[in-house]
């Protein structure tokens, strides 16, 4: 990554800190101490700025590596994320195997937001990668969004929309694991900073699930770090 010019710390140190924060669910102050124990004196506010700048960039550059659905049966749901004391909505999709498909943070929970998320998730996929089944809860917003996307040719006409509660157990369990990373934050200040941080959390969750395993030459945590 050539974006570290004029930075006081080496790029490897910055990526090390960003990766640890996004993968292990530690607070910025705890990570400051962990870095200090390894001989790197850096303030927690500096680590915060690194995460805001580089977590979205890491997600962007690694997206091609991990965002390839292994199943055409998707589970779609949203979970709550607090921003400035108010709830926002993190739309998420995984396939039936639990692999992350995509995510989108929205200030609203309605058909427009659902459509924007599903359009984002479908964008760039080959025809054979697009879902044949999408399972959601019984919120009417998803039915509206899927119907509109079909009418616009952005969603397969033959796609089946299911609303079977137990089928979404896999994504509800995945929400819980993501929340373990979000919990130490104790509330985001803005939607922008929340989304930037969540991008880091989501890409590290995807890597941890083995979604880029084909690029992990050693098959272990060191190989994951090299990606």
Which sequence ranges carry the predicted segments?
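Acidic/histidine-rich, metal-coordinating catalytic segments
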Residues: 130-144, 164-167
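DNA-recognition alpha helix
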Residues: 27-40
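Short conserved beta-strand segments at catalytic cores or DNA/RNA-binding microdomains
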Residues: 84-100, 110, 118-122
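Basic, short loop/linker segments at the boundary and entry of helix-turn-helix/winged-helix-like folds
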Residues: 1-23, 39-43, 48-49, 66-74, ...
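Short, basic alpha-helical nucleic acid-contact segments in DNA-binding proteins
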Residues: 49-69, 150-153
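Active-site beta-loop-alpha junctions of metal-dependent nucleic acid enzymes
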Residues: 53, 103-127
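Mobile genetic element proteins and their domesticated derivatives, centered on retroelements
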Residues: 17, 31, 47, 76-77, ...
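C-terminal domain-tail junction helix/linker
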Residues: 184, 196-204, 208-227
């Amino acid at each position: 990554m050539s974006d570290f010019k004029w930075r006081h710390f080496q790029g490897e140190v910055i990526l090390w800190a960003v990766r640890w924060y996004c993968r292990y669910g530690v607070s910025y102050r705890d990570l400051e101490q962990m870095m200090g124990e390894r001989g790197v004196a850096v303030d927690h506010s500096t680590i915060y700025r690194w995460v805001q700048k580089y977590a979205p960039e890491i997600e962007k550059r690694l997206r091609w590596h991990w965002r390839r659905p292994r199943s055409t049966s998707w589970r779609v749901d949203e979970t709550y994320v607090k921003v400035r004391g108010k709830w926002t909505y993190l739309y998420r999709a995984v396939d039936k195997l639990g692999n992350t498909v995509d995510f989108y943070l929205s200030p609203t929970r309605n058909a427009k937001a659902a459509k924007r998320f599903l359009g984002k998730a479908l964008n760039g996929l080959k025809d054979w990668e697009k879902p044949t089944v999408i399972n959601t809860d019984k919120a009417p917003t998803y039915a509206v969004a899927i119907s509109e996307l079909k009418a616009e040719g952005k969603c397969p006409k033959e796609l089946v929309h299911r609303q079977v509660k137990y089928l979404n157990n896999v994504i509800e369990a995945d929400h819980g694991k993501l929340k373990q990373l979000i919990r130490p934050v104790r509330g985001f200040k803005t939607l922008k900073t929340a989304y930037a941080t969540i991008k880091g959390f989501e890409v590290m969750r995807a890597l941890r699930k083995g979604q880029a395993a084909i690029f992990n030459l050693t098959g272990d945590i060191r190989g994951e770090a090299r990606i």
